[in-house]
Amino acid sequence: MPLFADRLRSRWGMHLAAVLWAAVWALCCIPAESGPLRAAAEVCGVSGGVVLFWLLWAAMAAAVEALHRASRSRSPWPRGGELLLCAEALGFFLLLWWVKGTRCSADFLGSLEQARSGAYNTIQPLSYTLLIGALDKLGPNSAANMAAQAGLFVTAAGVTGRWCRREGLPLLCGAGVVALLLPLCQWAIAVLVKDALYTCCFVIMTVGLCSLYRRDDAFSRTTLYGGMAGLVLLRPDALLIAAVTGLGVLTVARRRRSGVPAVALGISGVLFLGVAAHVLLPLALGARDDACGTRLAMPAEMLCEVVVHDADLPPQERERICRLIMPEPVLRRHHDSAPEWIGERYLWRGFDSAADLRQHSFVFHLAGRDREVLALCAELLPAHAGTALRPLIAHTRLLRDPSYTPALALGVLLFLAGLLLLRRLPLRAFLPFLPLLANIVIVTCVATTYEYRYALPLCAAAPLLLCYAGAVFMTPEAGEGQNRGRG
């Protein structure tokens, strides 16, 4: 193992590792079709997966070459290099906006209607609703909201450029990261949806974690806590990401015996901000608890899976499930109607009419039945755990099917984590990967539907962590020297 690691430290060893990685993922990606790159792929006469694969490989090769140069001397940037990356991000965003126009998601329109009417409910996070409502007053036709989203994307590009410059990476690496963000995220960053803001905040937080490896300074802390605060304000499940990341940062601070109170205070502040946004703010505004049954879709689908596949289920328990969740004939019909729409077969699809949907869909039928559904799950699922876990396994398809970009991004990240493990680096080198683990848990266990947007952070983090892993792998001594004696 030491001999193999020594070879990987060399320039050609790293190139060989990148080529081997490319060959493996080429075999996975050749039959794939990637939605955002399909048009470009058709022009080239190849599949979308091949185009995406070569983009990722080019970023990997550029990072490896940049690393080799950075290990000998710091790469000079032109004056205002970060501004060049900001201009690049803004140019890409405006071009896409000009070509596609202002595109709004159903979530955005629903929140905007709440903000304009003043009749708040908890279907969408109130912090997001109040934000877009305030921006809506500044400009017509959602122009202010689009401008704010573009500003956050440009900010993410700017902090990425600042980090690349501090690491001594060439300007080309930062430009490559910014250029890959839009296509890897299926252009969703230019759509008015809270997941676009969420993804930009995730990139900013990841930059902060990457910067922490070299130095714990104001830039690292500002990007880390700022990005994390944006996450918890936009989605309640981001509290899991904040908790996992905060625990990792606090553990590293304790091992280094430096800045523990400041880290604890910062993480506590972020978590309190999330709790205030999703618990205290609805109470203060008197928002109706109209959260539809989608938040119960996963436990309810587990119960449906037990009814369909577990022949040993006692008749009285089967009757209880069907009485609370859905009549058995309807349940079985929907289970077999659209198996490819994981997580949506009981929500929107397969119903005969609007009246049938309103009567039986989880969205309407389970609204306000949280206690009953969760109590039934706690009582019955432990005895049928093997069958009940099938929906969770099905939800991982988004992360393991190479025809989807998140699976490709996850493969890149696993490869990079393996390289860092070979280098036997300290724990703080793996901090940027912690939020991704929490995001995988969210996609698998918390997300109620099979939607690409839930995995956008995985895709957005991939090109950034390409450069990070390369810089850390090839030039770890600089970071170790600055933090010598602090764990």
What are these regions (language model features)?
Residues 1-94, 263-267, 428, 472-480:
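Start-transfer (signal-anchor) and selected internal transmembrane alpha helices
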Residues 98-111, 119-131, 135, 139-143, ...:
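Extracytoplasmic catalytic/substrate-binding loops of multi-pass membrane glycan-assembly enzymes
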Residues 116, 159, 199-214, 220, ...:
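Specific aromatic-rich, kink-prone transmembrane helix
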Residues 143-144, 362-363, 371-437:
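Membrane-interface anchor segments at the N-terminal boundary of transmembrane helices
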Residues 147-168, 204:
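Transmembrane-helix motifs of polytopic, lipid-linked glycan transferases
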Residues 190-198:
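Short acidic/glycine- and proline-prone juxtamembrane loop motifs at membrane-interface regions
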Residues 221-235, 246-247, 267-277:
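Membrane-interface alpha helices of multi-pass inner-membrane proteins
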Residues 286-399:
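Membrane-proximal stem/loop segments at transmembrane-domain junctions that anchor or position
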